[in-house]
């Protein structure tokens, strides 16, 4: 999953409507078994017809399904990637962003179903009394959910109905006949809602918990919400962001970072002609360049990955301005969390506390045998790599497995800490800073969707993340909270430090 930039194939452009059918998610997908062998370990869903099949690493029924149907695009339930069988590569496109959220929701829902004990009937009836109220209409799904609350011994029942363009809400108080009628309608609406519950809404509930996180409100409530939001920033500029950070209102800052913050440290990127890391791998005749980050390919041929690792291994690079800025935020008690895609451990070297750090794609800091899971030191792996030897498992008798740094590959799940912190942190976020990332790798990229009602700042070489599914609203007339700073992220962060008046403290951190 790390550093993969899937292509936009023709099937996601000219043939999107033919190949992608979102209605496949309307059916019950709580159990994602292969349709042919019932295996549950690693399955893909056909984005055209919704058939669930196992991967080539199990029994290969997904490939057989393609041969029989010629449906090109499938999505992974494991890592939420998309594969085009016709183009024979990983693919992605902006309209697939919301499908990533749906896949994450299904995965989270299945995991939760396995670990949560079954409640008795009385508990379920009690919970039914506090289900959040919401109505959502999308291009393919209409959802109605009822809400019943009791305030000062007075029961208020609200029922919501939706069409494709409007949402109306009616409320009846202290009228028994109307309450009974409304409750009857609510029961019917709730029943229908349970059958066709919007998967995106379920995604939010899984990440944030019921009754928490971004709220879905009626238009009148939305107007009030926007008025409240407009008080945070007078206008969406970096100068206003600096004032906001220095105010008492900003207490919990989340920073999302990508490879762009480490380029200034001398770490080469992947795709630059002649100098990019991928150029050095051409001689290994990879099936596709990103195969070096495929766990099954690694098990068969780990050498290309270790050639690449020599260019990235920690110890040869120093933190950058951005890393030390995040450290300063932590020292000032403003950093809630730093979610990073980087595997270079420069955040650790800069002194960002471990409890403030989420290495979403893992790192070189620890390593394990892919066969027996025995942990090995970074020094052991580094010594073998720089001797051009494969780091084999030596401490488990007869194992001889390959020792791999704990970097997340395709086919591997993100660290549990990623989901745990995302669920907890984004309900508290006062400010989101997104620095040096292309926002193309999911589910990391979709995190920006969950920073609701607070300022969001993009500091990047180019504008990214402006998708219609919760992305930045830089160029929209309604934008009051999203700020973009386009250019070199090191220079732009230095400018922000000056606006904040933190130059002396920053210089002291760098000096130390």
Swiss-Prot record:
Fetch the SUPFAM superfamilies from UniProt. Answer: DHS-like NAD/FAD-binding domain, RING/U-box
Q: Where is this region: Disordered?
A: 113-196
Record note on cofactor: Binds 1 zinc ion per subunit.
Q: Which keywords describe this protein according to UniProt?
A: Metal-binding, NAD, Transferase, Zinc, Zinc-finger
Name the needed cofactors.
Zn(2+)
> Where does this protein hold Zn(2+) 3?
46, 49, 65, 71
Compositional bias ranges of the Low complexity kind: 130-175
Stored InterPro entries: DHS-like_NAD/FAD-binding_dom, NAD-dep_sirtuin_deacylases, Sirtuin, Sirtuin_cat_small_dom_sf, Ssirtuin_cat_dom, Znf_RING/FYVE/PHD, Znf_UBP
The residues listed in the UniProt record as binding Zn(2+) 4, with positions renumbered to this chain, are 369, 372, 393, 399
Deacetylase sirtuin-type domain mapped to chain residues:
231-503
The active site consists of 361 (proton acceptor)
Q: Please give an example of a GO cellular component term from this record.
A: cytoplasm
Compositional bias, Basic and acidic residues, is annotated for: 113-122
Gene3D superfamilies, sorted: SIR2/SIRT2 'Small Domain, TPP-binding domain, Zinc/RING finger domain, C3HC4 (zinc finger)
Question: Which parts of the sequence are UBP-type zinc fingers?
Answer: 7-110
Enzyme Commission number(s):
2.3.1.286
**Which of this chain's residues are annotated to bind Zn(2+) 2?**
34, 37, 54, 61
Enzymatic reactions: N(6)-acetyl-L-lysyl-[protein] + NAD(+) + H2O = 2''-O-acetyl-ADP-D-ribose + nicotinamide + L-lysyl-[protein]
- Positions annotated to bind Zn(2+) 1: 9, 11, 84, 87
Any Pfam family from its record, for instance, is zf-UBP
Q: Name one GO molecular function term.
A: zinc ion binding
What domain of life does the native source organism fall in? Eukaryota
| Protein family (similarity comment) | Belongs to the sirtuin family.
Its function, per the record, reads:
NAD-dependent deacetylase, which plays an important role in the regulation of transcriptional repression.
Q: What is this protein called?
A: NAD-dependent deacetylase sir2A
Q: Which gene encodes it?
A: sir2A
């Amino acid at each position: 999953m790390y550093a993969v930039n899937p292509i936009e194939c023709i099937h996601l452009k000219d043939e999107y409507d033919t190949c992608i059918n979102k209605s496949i998610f309307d059916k019950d997908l709580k159990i994602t078994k292969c349709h042919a062998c019932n295996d549950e370990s690693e399955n893909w869903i056909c984005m055209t017809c919704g058939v669930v099949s196992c991967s080539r690493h199990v029994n290969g029924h997904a490939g057989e399904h393609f041969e029989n149907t010629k449906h090109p695009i499938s999505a992974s339930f494991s890592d939420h990637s998309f594969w085009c069988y016709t183009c024979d590569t990983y693919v992605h496109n902006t309209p697939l962003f919301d499908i990533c959220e749906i896949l994450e929701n299904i995965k989270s829902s299945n995991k939760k179903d396995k670990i949560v004990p079954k409640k008795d009937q009385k508990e379920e009836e009690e919970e039914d009394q506090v289900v959040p109220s919401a109505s959502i209409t999308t291009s393919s799904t209409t959802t109605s959910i009822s809400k019943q609350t009791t305030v000062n011994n007075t029961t208020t029942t609200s029922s919501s109905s939706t069409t494709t363009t409007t949402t109306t809400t009616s409320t009846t108080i202290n009228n028994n006949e109307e309450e009974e009628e409304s409750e009857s309608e609510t029961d019917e609406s709730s029943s229908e809602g349970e059958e066709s519950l919007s998967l995106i809404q379920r995604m939010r509930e899984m990440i944030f918990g019921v009754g928490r996180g971004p709220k879905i409100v009626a238009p009148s409530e939305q107007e009030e919400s926007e008025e409240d939001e407009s008080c945070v920033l007078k206008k969406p500029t970096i100068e206003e962001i600096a004032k906001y950070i220095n105010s008492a209102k900003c207490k919990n800052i989340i920073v999302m970072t990508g490879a762009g913050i480490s380029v200034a440290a001398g770490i080469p990127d992947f795709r630059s002609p002649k100098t990019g890391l991928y150029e050095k791998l051409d001689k290994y005749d990879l099936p596709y360049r990103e195969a070096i980050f495929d766990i099954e390919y690694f098990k068969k041929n780990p050498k290309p990955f270790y050639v690449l690792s020599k260019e990235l291994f920690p110890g040869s690079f120093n933190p950058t301005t951005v890393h030390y800025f995040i450290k300063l935020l932590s020292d000032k008690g403003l950093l809630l969390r730093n979610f990073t895609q980087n595997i270079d451990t420069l955040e650790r070297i800069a002194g960002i506390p471990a409890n403030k750090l989420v290495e979403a794609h893992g790192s070189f800091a620890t390593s394990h045998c892919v066969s027996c899971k025995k942990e090995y030191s970074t020094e052991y792996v580094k010594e073998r790599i720089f001797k051009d030897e494969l780091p084999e498992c030596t401490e488990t008798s007869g194992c001889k497995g390959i020792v791999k740094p704990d970097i997340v590959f395709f086919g591997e799940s993100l660290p549990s800490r990623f989901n745990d912190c995302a669920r907890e942190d984004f309900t508290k976020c006062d400010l989101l800073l997104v620095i040096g990332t292309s926002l193309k790798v999911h589910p990391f990229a979709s995190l920006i969707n969950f920073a609701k009602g607070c300022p969001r700042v993009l500091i990047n070489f180019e504008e990214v993340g402006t998708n219609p599914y919760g992305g930045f609203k830089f160029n929209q007339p309604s934008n009051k909270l999203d700020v973009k700073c386009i250019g070199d992220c090191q220079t732009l962060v230095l400018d922000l430090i000056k606006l904040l008046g933190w130059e002396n403290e920053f210089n002291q951190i760098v000096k130390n």
